From Swiss-Prot:
It comes from Candida glabrata (strain ATCC 2001 / BCRC 20586 / JCM 3761 / NBRC 0622 / NRRL Y-65 / CBS 138) (Yeast). This is Pheromone-regulated membrane protein 10. It comes from the Eukaryota. Residues 1-65, 77-103 are annotated as: Disordered. Residues 1-28 have a biased composition (Basic and acidic residues). PANTHER family: PHEROMONE-REGULATED MEMBRANE PROTEIN 10. Keywords: Membrane, Transmembrane, Transmembrane helix. It is found in: Membrane. GO terms for cellular component: membrane. Its main location: membrane. The chain crosses the membrane at residues 469-489, 491-511, 521-541, 545-565, 584-604, 620-640, 645-665, 675-695, 697-717, 751-771. It is a multi-pass membrane protein.
């Protein structure tokens, strides 16, 4: 009988173990499948709960396709002129762009406030942890206050092998010789990357499941031992059981009769109703042969489990209570190490998730800042890859004009989280210099990701150095300075150009900020007004006012030189999508300007029959005075693009050197715009790279004003901006209809073709200069160069 009972108990224990194992496997499989299937959506929801989200501009859902959205995005960027940083980057209607300023690139209402990601990560874990608040408080009382210091986020359990896409930029090809400025900019791919949030949560579930299995097996073994001991005591026929061996649960006492359960305790302790012919009627009594009824009035003491002589005194009861409470305390103390271990594991995962969110946030914020402040677009992806390598983040990046698609991978779960960083691209030389400083400190491990986030947010919140009304007058000043050296204007033309340039600046910085509808037609209206007024001033008799000089000088700062330069650099860097879209938009932009000039000149010619037709100036200024206007224009264009006064000396020196090369090479190579621009940009690139290597400056900010000096000079050498004047004269002529048909169609495209020639020459010269400074610079990659 006893042997059969033991077999039954062992079978039940094995059944309990098997059921626990099956439940464990099913719960783990269900949790893994549910998390892997909804990883991207859950990650985005977690990101929203942690305020890890990034402002985007209004989606162009009404546009028909991706290509049209790219064109419209470029149109709204306003980065086509020589002052792309303030074209329309500070528009008040674009409130979703990290900008909330008085025409300043600063942080905005949707900006992400700095928060303690440790608490946010703890909130994530609390939604998935199975610890009760009482257990957490008990563990905190046992000395878990040092969790933050003992938990290490560098545990290898949180690292995963790096996947293959990190090697995309290490192939043996032409990019190996693409050496650049910074001697420490290159970062080797990490051997291990940090796991994602989803992988950390799944690891938390695995720890909890293991703890559940261990606890269940421990409880099953203890219950098996207790039940066996009780049954053996019954078989031995003991009449009295000490208080410490009494069953704890009086409502679940098994009685065996022929190996089967014969009775169940239903009432208070001390009374048992049993059935059976040979039931052991007295478990704690004196009668050993009680037949049938436990309560038998005819036999003394047969109905009482505890007789009078076995009754416990009050002292015995108090002693028994103390023993029970002590036993419970020992049991809780035995569980403490396991719970403490689980809490430490959760603390490590919390710290890991917090640091992971901080690093991902830094990558996205730095990407936003680089796009806002004019980092070289053809190397944006490389900046982000180098940063993610240093931070041990598994990231992939795809750049489109005005948009960066970021994918954070989790190698442990084979899932990824996609973020879209979209903003208006501009140019801010001083803030770009500051962002570059933060970037250098982070990749050289001189600054953590959390400190980098604070610095980036501070830079985004800062106002521009110069307000819009100052930029309006600087616009007129730059227009006046560019007229003599680039377009051959006389002294009297400076005042007219200053007035007209200020009008263009007011249209750009004031009117475009007030109306979104007007900002879409700013270029056309500005060219119409400038052409109309320029021909009107040039038609004044004996005034020596040159129509061509004042018109081209007033429009010099909205020429699409910068955007064509970025497009040509992207195409040369094999960024086909971004380069093609940007180049095509620049051609259309040039046609807009040409159409506006033609229309404005035709309108005035229709109103006044004696309108001037002169394109070139008959009284040019002395060539030696031109060298005085180049540094003045450089200072003006640098201040418009928010350069600090400490950056001006290097900018002026490089710009003047480049113009000297342009001037003297133009004397020897007639009608060769692209070759002249290539020589000048080659010298500019060498000086900028040397400045960055020797004085540890930022090459791109030092070279951009010098590049802006080259664009008007190249345009003026062909007079292509006024190619529409012939069409305007023929439109208002008597035989206008027939004359227009004989006009060569190449005249309308000559301005765009000239711009492309100049930009191609500049891009070739810049790439050649980097090869000259860093002939073997694969692992000395300075990224912030043109």
């Amino acid at each position: 009988m006893a042997d059969s009972g033991d077999k039954d108990v062992s079978k039940s224990v094995r059944f309990d173990k098997e059921s626990i194992e099956s439940k464990k496997r099913s719960s783990v499989d269900d949790s893994a499948s549910s998390y892997s299937s909804s990883s991207s959506g859950q990650d985005r929801s977690e990101g929203k709960r942690n305020n890890v989200k990034f402002s985007t501009e209004d989606s162009d859902d009404e546009d028909g396709n991706l290509f049209s959205r790219m064109i419209k995005n470029l149109k709204s960027n306003g980065g086509a002129g020589l002052a792309p940083g303030l074209s329309k980057a500070n528009s008040n209607q674009e409130k979703t762009d990290l900008e909330d300023n008085d025409n300043v690139v600063t942080g905005h209402s949707d900006d992400i406030p700095m928060e303690d990601f440790t608490s946010e990560a703890q909130n994530i874990l609390q939604g998935h942890s199975n610890l009760t608040p009482a257990q957490i408080e008990a563990l905190n009382g046992q000395g878990l206050s040092d969790i933050e210091t003992t938990a290490s986020s560098t545990d290898l359990n949180f690292l995963a092998p790096a996947i293959d896409h990190f090697d995309d930029f290490d192939g043996d090809g032409e990019e190996e010789n693409d050496g650049f400025v910074d001697t420490h900019g290159y970062v080797a791919p990490p051997t291990q990357v940090r796991g994602g949030v989803l992988g950390s949560l799944l690891k938390l579930y695995q720890e909890q499941d293991n703890a559940t299995i261990e606890t269940s097996s421990m409880y099953s073994q203890s219950s098996y031992g207790e039940s066996t001991a009780n049954l053996m005591s019954i078989d031995s026929g003991e009449t009295e059981v000490p208080s410490e061996h009494k069953p704890k649960d009086h409502k679940n006492v098994f009685m065996r009769s022929g190996g089967k359960v014969a009775g169940l305790a239903m009432n208070a302790p001390g009374q048992i109703y049993g059935h059976g012919s040979k039931a052991a009627g007295h478990i704690y009594g004196h009668g050993r042969k009680g037949a049938g009824h436990i309560y038998n009035q005819g036999k003394k003491g047969a109905g009482h489990i505890y007789s009078q002589k076995n009754k416990l005194s009050s002292a015995d009861l108090s002693t028994e209570g103390l023993k029970k409470s002590g036993h419970k305390a020992k049991k809780v103390a035995g569980k403490m190490p396991k719970l403490r271990k689980r809490m430490l594991a959760e603390a490590k995962i919390t710290v890991h998730i917090a640091e992971l969110l901080q690093r991902q946030r830094f990558i996205l914020r730095m990407c936003k800042a680089l796009m806002l402040y004019g980092a070289p677009t053809h190397r944006l992806e490389e900046y982000m890859i180098m940063t993610s390598r240093v931070l041990e983040i598994d990231g992939q990046y795809l750049y489109l004009p005005g948009c960066m698609i970021v994918s954070f991978g989790d190698a442990t779960t084979r899932t990824s989280e996609v973020q879209l960083v979209r903003c208006t691209q501009g140019l801010n030389l001083w803030k770009l210099h500051q962002v570059h400083g933060v970037y250098k400190k982070v990749i050289h491990d001189q600054m953590g990701a959390d400190e980098g986030n604070i610095e980036i947010d501070r830079i985004l919140r800062e106002k521009n150095l110069y307000p819009p009304w100052v930029c309006v007058f600087l616009y007129g000043f730059c227009s006046a300075m560019v007229t003599p050296y680039a377009f051959g204007g006389h002294w009297i033309n400076l005042a007219i150009t200053f007035f007209m340039g200020s009008c263009v600046g007011m249209m750009q910085f004031i009117l475009s900020e007030k109306s979104l509808m007007y900002s879409n037609v700013f270029e056309i209206t500005a060219s119409i007004v400038v052409s109309f007024c320029g021909r009107a001033f040039g038609s004044i008799p004996n005034s020596n006012i040159c129509f061509g000089a004042i018109t081209q000088g007033s429009l010099a700062l909205i020429l699409p030189g910068y955007i064509i330069l970025c497009g040509s650099l992207e195409l040369q860097s094999r960024s086909l999508v971004a380069g093609s879209v940007r180049m095509f938009y620049a051609i259309i932009y040039s046609l807009f300007l040409g159409f506006g000039i033609t229309l404005g000149a035709a309108l005035f010619g229709w109103m006044y029959k004696g309108a001037t037709n002169e394109i070139s100036c008959g009284y040019p200024i002395s060539p030696w005075f031109r060298f005085l206007f180049v540094p003045a224009f450089t200072i003006g264009i640098s201040l418009i693009n928010q350069a600090n006064w400490t950056q001006l000396p290097a900018m002026v020196f490089i710009s003047c050197t480049g113009y000297v090369v342009t001037y003297w090479s133009g004397k020897h190579f007639q009608n060769s715009t692209e070759f002249t621009a290539a020589l000048a940009s080659f010298v500019i690139g060498i000086l900028g790279n040397l400045y960055s290597r020797i004085w540890q400056g930022l090459a791109v900010s030092a070279m951009l004003p010098a590049i802006f000096v080259q664009v008007p000079s190249g345009i003026a050498s062909q007079n292509s901006l006024l190619s529409g004047l012939q069409s305007a004269n023929q439109i208002v002529g008597r035989n206008g209809t027939n004359a227009v048909q004989t006009v060569d169609l190449s005249n309308s495209m000559s301005f765009g073709i000239t711009m492309i020639e100049v930009s191609i020459g500049i891009s070739v010269g810049l790439f050649a200069s980097t090869l000259c400074v860093y002939p073997f610079g694969k692992k000395k990659t300075g990224l912030f160069s043109l």
